[in-house]
């Protein structure tokens, strides 16, 4: 049985406080307060190893975009992917990472865990299960490989939220999605700065005419993410 809409909105509003904090380019990671302890307040139920405690998906999943549950589960699927990636990086960072880079990636890990748990709790019984991921194409011992993978995930995440916004029917969900994507955009800018200091962004993600970040439809996002998601994800009613 799905969570009642009123209960969902109340839960979203209560748990979203961490996403509304003011962020600065170099100190944005501080918005998590006391790090893991601060995140734990909204990531209640997250295991000590930061894993997703939802049962694994058997076969595949179908995301039905006829209502907001489909859009929220779409975001939840992508946050599962990002959280899994950063958990692996933070648990065993490349030897080429500096001490501050290790700390930043650990903090980003907590952000993504918070996002994942946020959507899981908002969806309640309507949430999809845990997706199986495959990071075999990423060399987690190599700094460049990890940074380029992180760049791909963050850029894709921003484009995904931008493209899904028009499909959200509930105003409160749209506002909260906007707050989450602003955090993802800060992640993306930071990763790009690590790869090429001072770059911040680029014409591959920001339209030179409009000055807006790229927006991608769910089918295009999932096609790109499919490289890392073993579970078959289908979409209907786009």
Regions found by a protein language model. Give the residues of each.
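All-alpha RGS (Regulator of G-protein Signaling) helical domain and cognate RGS-like helical scaffolds
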Residues: 2-8, 15-18, 33-34, 49-238
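N-terminal secretory signal peptides and thylakoid transit peptides that target proteins
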Residues: 15-36, 43
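Hydrophobic membrane-targeting alpha-helices
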Residues: 40-45, 49
């Amino acid at each position: 049985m799905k969570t009642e809409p009123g209960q969902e909105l109340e839960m979203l509003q209560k748990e979203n406080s961490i996403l509304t904090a003011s962020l600065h380019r170099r100190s944005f990671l501080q918005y998590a307060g006391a790090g893991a302890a601060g995140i734990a307040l909204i990531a209640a139920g997250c295991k000590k190893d930061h894993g997703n405690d939802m049962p694994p998906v058997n076969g595949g999943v179908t995301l039905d975009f006829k209502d907001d549950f489909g859009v929220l589960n779409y975001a939840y699927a992508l946050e599962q992917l990002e959280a899994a990636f950063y958990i692996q990086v933070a648990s065993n960072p490349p030897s080429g990472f500096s001490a501050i880079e290790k700390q930043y990636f650990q903090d980003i890990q907590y952000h993504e865990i918070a996002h994942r748990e946020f959507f899981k709790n908002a969806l309640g019984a309507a949430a999809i299960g845990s997706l199986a991921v495959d990071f075999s194409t990423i060399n987690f011992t190599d700094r460049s490989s990890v940074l380029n993978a992180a760049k791909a995930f963050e850029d894709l995440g921003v484009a995904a939220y931008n493209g899904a916004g028009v499909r959200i029917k509930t105003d409160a969900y749209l506002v909260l999605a906007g707050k989450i994507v602003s955090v993802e955009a800060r992640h993306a800018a930071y990763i790009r700065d690590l790869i090429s200091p001072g770059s911040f962004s680029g014409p591959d993600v920001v339209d030179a005419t409009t000055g807006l970040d790229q927006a991608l439809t769910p089918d295009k996002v999932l096609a790109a993410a499919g490289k890392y998601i073993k579970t078959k994800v289908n979409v209907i009613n786009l």
